[in-house]
Amino acid sequence: MAAQGFLLIASFLLILLVLAKPLGSGLARLIAAVPLPGVAGVERILWRTLGITDHEMNWRQYLLALLTLNLLGLGILFCLLFWQEWLPLNPQRLPGLSWDLALNTAVSFVTNTNWQAYSGESTLSYFSQMAGLTVQNFLSAATGIAVVFALIRAFTRQNVHTLGNAWQDLVRITLWILFPVALIIALFFIQQGVPQNLSAYQPITTLEGAKQLLPMGPVASQEAIKMLGTNGGGFFNANSSHPFENPTALTNLAQMLAIFLIPAALCFAFGEAAGDRRQGRALLWAMSFIFVVCVAVVMWAEVQGNPHLLAAGADSSVNMEGKEARFGVLASSLFAVVTTAASCGAVNAMHDSFTALGGMVPMWLMQIGEVVFGGVGSGLYGMLLFVLLAVFIAGLMIGRTPEYLGKKIDVREMKMTALAILVTPMLVLLGSALAMMTDAGRSAMLNPGPHGFSEVLYAVSSAANNNGSAFAGLSANSPFWNCLLAFCMFVGRFGVIIPVMAIAGSLVSKKVQPASQGTLATHGALFIGLLIGTVLLVGALTFIPALALGPVAEHFSLP
């Protein structure tokens, strides 16, 4: 089993790096505002048609453009969901959503969280899925990438005040990166058996003679961008454990690769844009190290399983509960770590059924800020926040003003960095405390004891860090939970983006200082270790007490 796990991890990472490297080169061209080959003429027509100028924006204008787009999308999506019954492509005549569920779902998909307090096949029409959720899957992913584009330009430019044109970046990211790659993935899914139609649900008779209604819909097109954009919201309630979303071992591998593809490519793009590819590789090494360790821990925990299974007469203690037999323990464990290391949230197994330690690792990966590869764009700018914190700590130790890529890191940057890093832990801890203190919060818990608390902690962690996966066991479709999690999702997304853009605006105006003998090298093994230690230290200090009350207590309660 150990050899199989090692081969699975190694082959996954090898294929990922082979695919991510060329995509990173394309992203680097977009960061430099250089059109991809053959599209310059098309872009000129698009800019004239859409009324987009070449005028570059400062950080406030860039941020305002992104916020305007996302708030407009939030309002439109809320209306689509609330008045769903009056809109076309609703063959099952599904009613509109309640105001609190519509708000929660709209915020969820606009913020790239894709938390779902509903069952897709029994709640949403095809129009809501296509014109509402799928559109936001593209736009939320493009928003995250645009933010990291602006931050990278802040490091590579000097003595200016502009970070690019947000509208041009959004169009280029959507048309030349997200759409073509998603199209290729969708066609592959269709070839593997994922439905793509607008047919009404199909009544069938099973082999046992029972009647069943099979849901249909444009699944493949939404599934592709769901994974590529690290969105994660399933067309069906069972998400990627549903055979119509994830029918084969090949689609399972393709989905995991799609989740990490753009986050890994952005590391390569960062190195190219910075003029030193070692900088991007250093971040990739740090992410990969944490990722491999986490996968190994989850695989070990799930293979060791639960001793209660043997006592109940099972043939093995290996924890197959909540997992698809066609994927098995190892592939399910790898998928769980991939989807929570990135801010995706898609699942091919029920995380609530993992062992205590096996479920704690995905929860902790979310709590450290989704920086181990992370979401498209958000993962890299989140890790760069920890880079700034790491160089600040190193500067304190050696008595020098901290700097990164030749840019001095001053008080303003550190204030914004601290603010951005503290946003999600505050949301998680205060939100979980509020839920446990109120009757409305506790009434949704279906399990008592440490596991029940773990379900609450996981839900708030998932929302605040824009992941979207769930432990289940929590009746979250209530006004209290819909509003609480919507608030956590919105602030967890834009409460980080705003200080990140402020950091970009401050850095872009600074001069690049030449390296000296006292300059800390930020591409070697020493800095990689310092960066990993910073991430682990912040995560440990912040969440160990809460984790001790949940999964740790549950683990030690086993015989």
Swiss-Prot record:
Subunit (UniProt): The system is composed of three essential subunits: KdpA, KdpB and KdpC.
Keyword Ion transport carried by entry: yes
Compartments (UniProt record): Cell inner membrane
Gene giving rise to this polypeptide: kdpA
Protein name in UniProt: Potassium-transporting ATPase potassium-binding subunit
Transmembrane segments: 5-25, 27-47, 63-83, 132-152, 170-190, 253-273, 283-303, 327-347, 356-376, 379-399, 416-436, 484-504, 524-544
PANTHER family reported in the protein's UniProt record: POTASSIUM-TRANSPORTING ATPASE A CHAIN, POTASSIUM-TRANSPORTING ATPASE POTASSIUM-BINDING SUBUNIT
Domain of life where this protein originates: Bacteria
Keyword Transmembrane attributed: yes
GO CC terms in record: plasma membrane
Cystine pairs: none
Mode of membrane association: Multi-pass membrane protein
Example of a GO MF term: P-type potassium transmembrane transporter activity
Family statement drawn from the similarity comment of this UniProt entry: Belongs to the KdpA family.
